[in-house]
Amino acid sequence: MVDVNRFKSMQITLASPNKVRSWSYGEVKKPETINYRTLKPEREGLFDEVIFGPTKDWECACGKYKRIRYKGIVCDRCGVEVTRAKVRRERMGHIELKAPVSHIWYFKGIPSRMGLTLDMSPRALEEVIYFAAYVVIDPKDTPLEHKSIMTEREYRERLREYGAGSFVAKMGAEAIQDLLKQVDLEAEIAVLKEELKTASGQKRIKAVRRLDVLDAFYKSGNKPEWMVLNILPVIPPDLRPMVQLDGGRFAASDLNDLYRRVINRNNRLARLLELNAPGIIVQNEKRMLQEAVDALIDNGRRGRPITGPGSRPLKSLSHMLKGKQGRFRQNLLGKRVDFSGRSVIAVGPTLKMYQCGVPREMAIELFKPFVMREIVARDIVQNVKAAKRLVERGDERIWDILEEVIKEHPVLLNRAPTLHRLGIQAFEPVLIDGKALRLHPLVCEAYNADFDGDQMAIHVPLSEEAQAEARILMLAAEHILNPKDGKPVVTPSQDMVLGNYYLTMEEAGREGEGMIFKDMDEAVMALRNGYVHLHTRVGIATDSLNKPWTEDQKHKILITTVGKILFNAIMPEELPYLQEPTNANLTEGVPAKYFLESGQDIKEVIEQLEINVPFKKKNLGNIIAEIFKRFRTTETSALLDRLKNLGYHHSTLAGLTVGIADIPVVEDKAEIIEESHKRVEQITKQFRRGMITDDERYNAVTAEWRAAREKLEKRLVANQDPKNPIVMMMDSGARGNISNFSQLAGMRGLMAAPNGRIMELPILSNFREGLSVLEMFFSTHGARKGMTDTALKTADSGYLTRRLVDVAQDVIIREDDCGTDRGLLITSITEGKEMIESLEERLNGRYTKKTVKHPETGAVIIGPNELITEDKAREIVNAGVEEVTIRSVFTCNTRHGVCRHCYGINLATGDAVEVGEAVGTIAAQSIGEPGTQLTMRTFHTGGVASNTDITQGLPRVQEIFEARNPKGEAVITEVKGEVTAIEEDASTRTKKVFVKGQTGEGEYVVPFTARMKVEVGDQVSRGAALTEGSIQPKHLLAVRDVLSVETYLLAEVQKVYRSQGVEIGDKHIEVMVRQMIRKVRVMDPGDTDLLMGTLMDITDFTDANRDVVISGGVPATARPVLMGITKASLETNSFLSAASFQETTRVLTDAAIRGKKDHLLGLKENVIIGKIIPAGTGMARYRNLEPQAVNEVEIIDEVTELPDGFETEENIVLK
């Protein structure tokens, strides 16, 4: 076998008859499989050992030669070669067909490749191939047309008319083969090229298609007649196995049945030909042979599929490749792996961030070879076999060895569905008792895991390199930030939030208020002895707290609470003391009002201070982000563990419980509802008098009930007790929100009916009072819809992710700087008055293209090609700059990928992205993973203002990425100028908008009901929307440039996600949109050898033009093409990637005719052939490094952690 890592590329072509013979080890002549008495394969049958190799290792069929020493000998009695049985997976046979047979892929595919080559309609081809008509192959001197079709009757009449032998006409695949042999590719191509210069319309389209196929044959060196088979390959027997079941019966692959039919019919045809049987019988047999081969290659493609027992269609060769269960997706892209296990997960609150608990039984099985090696190395037993027995017996000595083996050996934990790269992370295993894996509570959010019965899989990286990569790149403590937006993904949740919230609460007048302590120990002692409470406001000497105080603050008394002293004790010393949950406190330090001036009375000062709100979930997130920015991963993960421990400890001490009495009831609820009832009555009266329409009445009623619910909500918030446990949970962000609270204590409000329309009758009760039977019934609609929506959404979102990954999987950071001379001008994204994404957010982590100057002073804020940090972005925006030209993925010149400068920082690390980062896959995951959080609905605007549906949520994202015609499409102008008039035409129920510009004027018809975006006198640019709604990107591309379309698509995707509260970095969407617009269609080939109408990559097009321009020729012209992600995936240069995505047979048919080469640039194609992927450390530039010895002495600070959680530094000298 060739070493898979030595491949440069992989090519697929049509197989010539000689090629098939060269693969074959012998002809299969009989349809038999195995002898039912001896269970040995039959000679010359489908499982013959002479052809395919021995069934047992190193043993011939008759048993004369056994053992490896006879390797390579062919037995003189039975003719079987002595070799491994594994060759039965690779040796092929063949069947010599007694009549040529057309290959169904090339005849039946769309478009029919045979039809285009011969310039015949698929209908005519079918009649000829299946013996319903004759085709003229050589008219000789008769007036018959070449390739004309005639029925049996017409044929006989012509024979009578012109005489026998006066012309040649045949039927069946043989006729087609003769015609294909006659095709002169060069001449046909020349004729078509001439024809294209004048042709137009349908004729032109057909000529372009035909030219495409003929050119493919010509360039690839494939011969058209190879589309008709004279010899049929038989795949190796172990790929179509036959196994004995318990009851002595056999289960065999369907392929054996299909091959058997072919052989039977082929043998019968041979006999009929020998006997000189009548023509009609031979024809019938040939037709049946053709149908049998069709069924073998692609059963069900033509006519009714051949069925097996229980009328189940048999699985043909094509079906073996297709779909989720096919070869590509089931076996090549998704293999099962050894050294893995799965179990239920349980919480491990005592673990460190980088640890996970592995049950002993699991660990011993997973690390068995490592343990066995160590047992032998220690001379406990002499050989591996004995070591294996020792492990399987569960000897006492193995446990200590296991402990040592797993030390420093990371394992990978994965939870399905793996929606983004944080779904697989590495941990150091810790042995535990029990049978459940233990998971650190903070990584749950990344995995989206909870402990209600979730299961996780565990994998062991084996090689040293794999362990090193797992430890350096995948350790859970490294994954602090979410790759989609660069915000921390490991924020404390639930109990941890609640504990820290309770700890940092303040209360006026608690015991011991105004006490002053010299240091933290004293405060803690007072707390333990009951002199003060956690929430008591006290004073403490600032110099006892190791914090970055100013000179002025150093020797003062700080007013804080005991809880906050404990909270700050776990924070890094360099961080300011956190007294109030504000950004100013976090970045600049404690405000002056909390310090006691000399001579002031502490109690008076405390009374004047307002009560601070405690630290909530989002404040903790901000603290973590700030710490990450300052200290990076090691310190952050240590802090997270301390936050977790503190949170759990204090939520346990707080002992929050919820009882029914904790749900307050709003006093004046009855009055609020009574008022609303009266208003609804007034609205109904207005409707009855005909003052308003039914739609207006419906909108007014639902708005009234919404207002009532909001009023109740406001009352609840105003009257809530900050120490109420439900309020604390809600306010801290630990669990629940105001909507849940108001359903418990206010009113449930309006519900949706099964058809999605909001019902006018609201549910007036809340859960505290209890619902009536009718209300209960109403509320079940909503609950049921919620469940079905979630289920549908999950599937939709998963499929979207799959398509996104497929289209961008080969986008990798390939170089440092592409040297582009273009940039992208960006501003903030807005929708009307609403800010969608600010300029500051968009600038952060990108490189500038041009110098940015202060608009007033003209001072340079940042030079060209420099990284914009968070602080720089803030400085630019604060200076009043409104637009900046940055380096963007849209304008990157790198082939097959992106360069570092156009991409910017890697959001997952906060540092500049590295060469080799698979940014395409990360982008796809970042857009797909939040897909489940988006809504499914298409909103009705209530039928009053407009009659268009506005698509939002997941359907809108799919609409954008598939480049579909949007629902509620906006009318756009092709003219730049002024809107001169808007006329209404009552007869056609339309409006006409007139735009006049310097280049001409445009008249646009818009529906009567559409909402106008422009007024008379407005200035509009090309491609501007005249009405509300979504612009169709393909129309926009026709009137504007590529960059405008890309910018529009980016903004549209951001609008959907941001409106649902999901933040995604621009660069991820840029990567995706760029993949949709990579291709151009050739309009005029000029002097290049490109074909008109061909779809090709923009880089290949530029290369072809460059060569022609250098030699002084006329360059080709082309126009950009916007493709949806599904189409873009299928049009990729890699046939392996496209075939494993969708439409497998079509992709392979096309690739074979073109003799396509796959250069293995993407990730999928390398996974398929089992080669290391060309991203990260798999890139060629990293694989081909030569290690070199360096003799310098290097001093490294090693950080080790002591049992008390504090760290020491030792200097280690490396020789």
Swiss-Prot record:
GO terms for cellular component: DNA-directed RNA polymerase complex. Zn(2+) 2 binds at residues 818, 892, 899, 902. It catalyses: RNA(n) + a ribonucleoside 5'-triphosphate = RNA(n+1) + diphosphate. Zn(2+) 1 binds at residues 60, 62, 75, 78. Belongs to the RNA polymerase beta' chain family. Binds 1 Mg(2+) ion per subunit. GO terms for molecular function: DNA binding; DNA-directed RNA polymerase activity; magnesium ion binding; zinc ion binding. InterPro entries: DNA-dir_RpoC_beta_prime, DNA-dir_RpoC_beta_prime_bact, RNA_pol_asu, RNA_pol_N, RNA_pol_Rpb1_1, RNA_pol_Rpb1_3, RNA_pol_Rpb1_3_sf, RNA_pol_Rpb1_4. It comes from the Bacteria. HAMAP family: RNApol_bact_RpoC (MF_01322). Keywords: DNA-directed RNA polymerase, Magnesium, Metal-binding, Nucleotidyltransferase, Transcription, Transferase, Zinc. DNA-dependent RNA polymerase catalyzes the transcription of DNA into RNA using the four ribonucleoside triphosphates as substrates. Its EC number is 2.7.7.6. The keyword Transferase applies. Its cofactor is Mg(2+); Zn(2+). The RNAP catalytic core consists of 2 alpha, 1 beta, 1 beta' and 1 omega subunit. When a sigma factor is associated with the core the holoenzyme is formed, which can initiate transcription. It holds the Pfam family RNA_pol_Rpb1_5. This is DNA-directed RNA polymerase subunit beta'. The keyword Secreted does not apply. It comes from Streptococcus sanguinis (strain SK36). Mg(2+) binds at residues 450, 452, 454.
